[in-house]
Swiss-Prot record:
<dbReference type="Pfam" id="PF02146">
    <property type="entry name" value="SIR2"/>
</dbReference>
<dbReference type="GO" id="GO:0017136">
    <property type="term" value="F:histone deacetylase activity, NAD-dependent"/>
</dbReference>
<dbReference type="InterPro" id="IPR003000">
    <property type="entry name" value="Sirtuin"/>
</dbReference>
<keyword id="KW-0963">Cytoplasm</keyword>
<feature type="binding site">
    <location>
        <position position="136"/>
    </location>
    <ligand>
        <name>Zn(2+)</name>
    </ligand>
</feature>
<comment type="function">
    <text>NAD-dependent protein deacetylase which modulates the activities of several enzymes which are inactive in their acetylated form.</text>
</comment>
<dbReference type="InterPro" id="IPR026591">
    <property type="entry name" value="Sirtuin_cat_small_dom_sf"/>
</dbReference>
<feature type="active site" description="Proton acceptor">
    <location>
        <position position="125"/>
    </location>
</feature>
<keyword id="KW-0520">NAD</keyword>
<feature type="binding site">
    <location>
        <position position="40"/>
    </location>
    <ligand>
        <name>NAD(+)</name>
    </ligand>
</feature>
<dbReference type="InterPro" id="IPR026590">
    <property type="entry name" value="Ssirtuin_cat_dom"/>
</dbReference>
<feature type="binding site">
    <location>
        <position position="109"/>
    </location>
    <ligand>
        <name>nicotinamide</name>
    </ligand>
</feature>
<feature type="binding site">
    <location>
        <position position="29"/>
    </location>
    <ligand>
        <name>NAD(+)</name>
    </ligand>
</feature>
<feature type="binding site">
    <location>
        <position position="133"/>
    </location>
    <ligand>
        <name>Zn(2+)</name>
    </ligand>
</feature>
<feature type="binding site">
    <location>
        <position position="110"/>
    </location>
    <ligand>
        <name>NAD(+)</name>
    </ligand>
</feature>
<dbReference type="GO" id="GO:0070403">
    <property type="term" value="F:NAD+ binding"/>
</dbReference>
<feature type="binding site">
    <location>
        <position position="198"/>
    </location>
    <ligand>
        <name>NAD(+)</name>
    </ligand>
</feature>
Length: 250
């Protein structure tokens, strides 16, 4: 790991990215804080400092207390949908367009990478665009879930079969989606991973940094993989990416 001032860290990161044969990016909640979405674990500001996620956004609550899930947990999910991408999201989209990165793996469910124009996005924790019927599998829009909840249809029911609807978000207790298998393959084929805004404590996504030779971490707080990283940058995502991207283009 390199201990340098920010200017030299940006330079080192840019050099690693330019020399990489295939670079993937892994993003966590920290990339979206500048869009007004609270992250989950930062001291003093983390969303889970005030509530237990396993008691709010879990399959246990969804199945055993669906009313509680839709009155508390669902509101958290719904609140993320009004956010807009910030500079960091747009830079990653531009980097993908220019062939500098191969794609983005995200732990986020806020859809901001797609809003910013990123094409190859692996949403390993699901999304807030769709929902599904637990009985017949019918796909519905997240907007329909919101409409039903707003009309006090709690839990919301499938118009086709009457089964309970749920958002297509990976809850605590859910298996990982197919997107994770695809993301895993991408990382195994890469020689560099850029981690942005993730504390790297949530399994199994936190295994990914150990599968590549090159590692850049941009995060506000320490991670368990700092010791392995070639570069660790303690700056806001947009500021760090702006400087790195300018160096790559120069």
């Amino acid at each position: 790991m390199f201990f340098m001032d920010s200017k030299n860290l940006f330079k080192k990161a840019a050099e690693l990215i330019k020399s990489s044969q295939k670079t993937m990016v892994l993003t966590g909640a920290g990339i979206s804080t500048e869009s007004g979405i609270p992250d989950f674990r930062s001291p003093g500001t983390g969303l889970w400092e005030n509530m237990d996620p396993t008691e709010v956004l879990s399959t246990k609550v969804l199945f055993n207390s669906p009313e509680e899930f839709y009155r508390v947990g669902f509101k958290i999910l719904s609140s993320m949908r009004n956010a807009e991408p910030n500079e960091a999201h747009y830079i990653l989209s531009e980097m993908e367009k220019e062939g500098i990165i191969a794609g983005v793996i995200t732990q986020n469910i806020d859809n901001l990478h797609q809003k910013a124009g990123s094409k190859k996005v692996y949403e390993v924790h699901g999304n807030t665009r769709e929902g599904s019927c637990l009985r017949c599998g019918e796909k519905v829009s997240f907007e329909l879930l919101e409409e039903k909840v707003a009309k006090e249809e709690i839990p919301p029911r499938c118009d086709r079969c009457g089964g309970m609807l749920r958002p297509d978000v990976v809850l605590f207790g859910d298996p990982m989606p197919h997107a994770f298998d695809l993301a895993l393959k991408e990382v195994q084929e890469s020689d560099l991973l850029i981690v942005i805004g993730s504390s790297l404590v949530v399994a199994p996504v936190n295994f990914l940094p150990g599968m590549v030779d090159g590692l850049i971490i941009i995060n506000a707080t320490e991670t368990p993989y700092d010791y392995k990283a070639d570069v660790v940058i303690r700056e806001k995502a947009s500021y760090a990416l702006r400087n790195i991207w300018n160096l790559i283009k120069s």
